[in-house]
Design a protein with these regions (language model features):
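Helical scaffold of the NTase/Pol beta-like nucleotidyltransferase catalytic core
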Residues: 1-28, 59
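Generic detection of long, well-ordered alpha-helical segments
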Residues: 2, 6, 57-60, 153, ...
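Short secondary-structure capping/turn segments at boundaries of alpha-helices and beta-strands
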Residues: 14-16, 33-37, 48, 67-70
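A generic short-segment signal for beta-strand/edge and adjacent turn/coil regions
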Residues: 14-19, 48-53, 98-104, 161
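Short helix-loop boundary/capping segments at the starts of domains
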Residues: 18, 53-56, 69-73
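Short helix-terminating capping/connector loops at secondary-structure junctions
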Residues: 21-23, 41, 74-77
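Catalytic metal-binding acidic patch
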Residues: 31, 36-62, 78-85
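Conserved NTP/Mg2+-binding pocket subregion across the NTase superfamily
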Residues: 65-174
Length: 174
């Protein structure tokens, strides 16, 4: 199983390097994989891609297409990815702007109209405050410099609000 996870991570890294080239700042693993409690049957693979500049629509589409291929090698819960700009990692803003999300929850929309979905898939996300905090403390740099060189401090109030928001949504989603 560890070999399978390593293959998935290598594919993610190769895909991002190919698509974003010099625009890619880093790829950071968080969640159960970073905490060392990953369970193939119950966990997803959580990661954040950081770029210097906003990706083009074509880059977003290519990323989603490649992640859908990689997802076939993944656990049932799949991949959960957010693409964010470097400026918001370093100079934190809450709720945090994002360029693209990918997860099982979005798959159907990707298949319905990939271009339209990628064109409109951006906004802000309160969950990123918690993700950034975890990445800075326990995250794994799959590619790029260490997390503490990319991610600034998240104010405690934003971190706690992010967790509160996640708990409130968990009740609805369960």
């Amino acid at each position: 199983m560890e070999l399978q996870i390593q293959k998935v991570l290598e594919q993610i890294k190769a895909t991002c390097m190919d698509i974003f080239s010099t625009n890619l700042v880093g790829i950071y693993i968080h969640g159960s994989l970073a905490f060392g409690c990953f369970n193939w049957d119950k966990s997803d693979i959580d990661f954040i891609i950081v770029t210097r500049l906003s990706p083009t629509l074509q880059e977003k589409e290519k990323l989603v297409e490649d992640l859908l291929k990689i997802d076939k090698m993944c656990p049932r819960k799949g991949l959960e990815m957010s693409l964010v700009l470097e400026e918001y990692c370093h100079d934190f803003l809450y709720p945090t702007p994002f360029e693209l999300h990918f997860s099982n929850a979005h798959k159907q929309k990707f298949f319905e109209n990939l271009s339209e979905y990628c064109a409109h898939m951006n906004g802000t996300d309160k969950d990123l405050a918690a993700h950034f905090t975890i990445i800075k403390q326990s995250g794994i740099a799959l590619y790029g410099e260490k997390a503490d060189g990319v991610f600034g401090d998240v104010p405690k109030a934003n971190y706690l609000d992010s967790i509160k928001h996640d708990i409130e949504n968990a009740v609805v989603e369960i």
